[in-house]
Every structure is written in C-alpha cells, then in structure tokens.
Regions:
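Generic alpha-helical structural context detector
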Residues: 35, 121, 156-159
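Short, flexible active-site-adjacent loop segments at beta-strand->alpha-helix junctions, enriched
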Residues: 3-6, 43, 72, 142, ...
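Protease zymogen maturation seam
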Residues: 1-64, 78, 213
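Substrate-binding/access-modulating region of protease and related hydrolase catalytic domains
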Residues: 126, 142-221
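Subtilisin-like serine protease catalytic core
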Residues: 25, 29-30, 52-153, 169-178, ...
C-alpha cells in the first residue's frame, strides 16, 4: 500500500486557546489544566476566571506505580502526601529490589535542579496532578555530585523491579508501572529506509518537543 493511499486521521476535537494561566487556588482554578485537557469544548480561552467546574477524578492513579526518571525528587514535598498525610513516595533501593548488581549512590533521593520534582508534581501531585493517589517512585538519572545512576542501570533496574513485583491482593494482578522520562536527547535517524517504508513496516519514531522556556522557540515534530 502506498503512503498516499492512507487516509488522514480525523481528530476528535481541535481547540485553540491561551495556556498562560496562573496557579492560584481560588475556587477551581487549581484544576483548570485537568479540565482544559479533558474537555472537547474550550472552556477557558484567554480567561483566568473560575468557570465553576470541578474535575471529576474517576481515575486517580489508585493501584498504579508512577516512576519519574529525571533529576531526582524533593523528598519532603507536601504534594506527595495522601489524604491521611502519609507520603506516597517509595524510597526503595533500586538495585536491591530489581536484583541488578550495583550500588545506589548516596543522596540518590535529592533534586538540586527541580525539574524532576516539577514533572512528578504534574503526574501525581495531590493539587495539580493527574494521578493524585498513585504510588510515586524516583530514579535520578541527571544529578550532581555522583548521586545519579547510569542509563544502562536505569533500564535494567526498571525491568527487574517490575518483573519482581508481587501480585496486588486488591486486584489479583501486578500493579501497573507508568514511567515518565521528560528530557531530550539528540541523535540521527537512518534515512536508508524512506519514511513510507518505515510507516508501512509498522515502525514508529515518536519525536516530541515542548516545555521550553521563553516564547522564541520553534518546535518541530
């Protein structure tokens, strides 16, 4: 089949709007992002006014393990606490839990940059997060003073840890693992196979751009 014969995908909904919102917690403003991303109707536009709408947490991450692979995590952040005030952050030894040979660095559970803490707040923070009841795990891949682990160990530890998970008695299956890696890396894609050949062979390259500072950046996807 020729690539030209493949029909264009039809979007479910298309919205435009100004995402420059404040993080005020007046009314329902703390959840404007969750509402904005799950509604086919553009509810906010350029307005920062409270629309009187609440975000219904039908799915809140209960029974799910979320892993942030980044610059680390601020351990004592109040956003990780559950409704009882207990932190959902699980400070495990990745080498011990995965069975991978190695030593976890000292000060592994720190974040001198802040990016990892920011990302997990979006993922699972109790105020602005999507999965506010999920368990939180952190792997420091980009750290300072030798507190990070290598790429190879990160992959091996994640696989080994997930494979070693016990059955969750609440569900009868292993807890799902969701891993977030919010960072960039540069490489070249081999152009020997043409884009048509790549797509028709069911192989995909996911290239995404975002979260840059400032307004002068041009994104190419």
């Amino acid at each position: 089949q020729d690539i030209a014969d493949i029909p264009e995908p039809t979007p479910v909904a298309v919205q435009t709007g100004n995402f420059n919102k404040t993080t005020t917690q007046t009314g329902q403003q703390d959840n404007w992002g969750l509402i904005r991303h799950t509604s086919e109707t553009q509810l906010y536009g350029a307005s920062t006014a409270d629309q009187g709408i609440t975000y219904d947490y039908v799915l809140d991450g209960t029974g799910v393990d979320m892993v942030i692979v980044d610059t680390g995590i601020q351990v004592g952040h109040p956003e990780w606490r559950d409704s009882e005030g207990v932190s959902r952050l699980q400070q495990i030894n990745w080498y011990t839990e995965s069975g991978v040979a190695g030593t976890q660095p000292a000060n592994f559970y720190t974040d001198t940059n802040g990016h990892g803490t920011h990302c997990i707040g979006t993922m699972a923070g109790k105020t602005f997060g999507w999965a506010k009841n999920a368990n939180i795990y952190s792997i420091t891949l980009y750290g300072n003073s030798g507190n990070a682990i290598s790429w190879n160990d990160m992959i091996d530890c994640l696989i080994g840890w997930h494979n070693n998970k016990p059955i969750d008695p609440a569900t009868g299956v292993k807890r799902p693992t969701v891993v977030n890696m919010s960072f960039q890396y540069s490489w070249y894609i081999d152009t020997s196979p043409t884009p048509d050949q790549v797509i028709l062979s069911s192989t995909g390259y996911n290239i995404l751009g975002g979260s840059h500072r400032g307004v002068a950046h041009t994104e190419t996807t």
